[in-house]
Curated annotation (Swiss-Prot):
PROSITE patterns per UniProt: SHMT
Keyword Amino-acid biosynthesis: yes
Family annotation (InterPro entries): PyrdxlP-dep_Trfase, PyrdxlP-dep_Trfase_major, PyrdxlP-dep_Trfase_small, Ser_HO-MeTrfase, Ser_HO-MeTrfase-like, Ser_HO-MeTrfase_PLP_BS, SHMT-like_dom
Residues reported to bind (6S)-5,6,7,8-tetrahydrofolate: L121, G125, H126, L127
N6-(pyridoxal phosphate)lysine sites (modified residues): K230
E.C. designation(s): 2.1.2.1
Cross-referenced CDD domains: SHMT
Record-given protein name: Serine hydroxymethyltransferase
Record-stated family: Belongs to the SHMT family.
Catalysis performed (reactions): (6R)-5,10-methylene-5,6,7,8-tetrahydrofolate + glycine + H2O = (6S)-5,6,7,8-tetrahydrofolate + L-serine
Keyword Transferase: yes
Gene name of this polypeptide: glyA
Cofactor(s) needed by this chain: pyridoxal 5'-phosphate
Record site: Plays an important role in substrate specificity: H229
Amino acid sequence: MFDKSQTLAKVDAEIYKAIVLEETRQETHIELIASENYTSPAVMETQGSKLTNKYAEGYPCKRYYGGCEYVDMVEQLAIDRAKTLFGADYANVQPHSGSQANAAVFQALLVPGDTILGMSLAHGGHLTHGATPSFSGKNFNSIQYGLNQKTGEIDYEQVEVLAKRYKPKMIIAGFSAYSRMVDWQRFREIADSVGAYLMVDMAHVAGLIATGEYPSPVAIADVTTTTTHKTLRGPRGGLILAKSNKTIEKKLNAAIFPGIQGGPLMHIIAAKAVSFKEAMSDEYKTYQKQVKINAQVMANTFIKRGFDVVSGGTDNHLFLVSFIDQGLTGKAVDTALGSAYITVNMNAVPNDPNPPFVTSGIRVGTPSVTTRGFNEIDCSDLASWMCDICDDLGNQEVIYKIRGRVVSLCAKYPVYLDD
């Protein structure tokens, strides 16, 4: 038997120390990585529950193991809440990640060698949308579309031309670094014109979509995938949604289990259910609205200070800043901001002359700072501090001064209030 007094600090002091240090970092640094967020104490409590002990291969009421009556309740709640939240006819809450959700769709609807059409990683797509290092680029004939050079927005004419030329079996819409509204219906029309499936990866904007702050693709696409963290603010995991089609639903279920996964993570599925419930609250709607406002304020500040924001602004939670004109690298800017306790990620930008481990830009996102409580004034100040650092990159006096401001602002807005 286990003794509850044997806490982590007693059992593994090294891991405990690392966790405490990370907790301190999260409280004292400003997090601007667009794919990150802080999840709620209720979600974290659920992830640490005894549900982690239960194996439950299969689906609710169709398990291969006994003793699943209570985890069936949990998974069915997660399914029902996901369908309600996003207006979907079908939901699979078992994917361990967004990439596995995408892999399951590929396995369900395609065979190796089929042609796919997805957004180029260099222009804001995701690895699983056909990038060469990914399974999606290795196992399938991947054709890539990109951005219009003048507008910095998706080149729908190029998508249509490529679709007609290569006749893909599936077109993938969605992104990991794109700041504008996507015309899901335009993608649907292009897919229909060549008889292709349309898959949408809405991982980055799922929270905005859940509250109507960004257009929903769920009723338009054949299949929609997402992560459950990022803007959605739940546990790390994946989700597959679809409109009613029994054939596709059966294929999707089989692709997850037994296709690419075995037992589902019931403690994570329960945490997903909790986060879906949280996402139905009025407070959450207010939060998502502020996420957009904060991103727009920050992007506009960079523009006013003379920096190139790709596409000229943002309609969601993120934006890209290109430093090609300044001759700066994304890596150098990332490092300098990090020294001031401002965390971003270097990111490739259109026509980037630098390799992926260097880049010429950064990606900035506001989900985390908005969770802390930052408002427009805070975000305007923050963007100005970032511009000050970029204007005099490497000036340690500037970095030190701004680091002090960052620590003070973080103290004003703690992530987790003490009891």
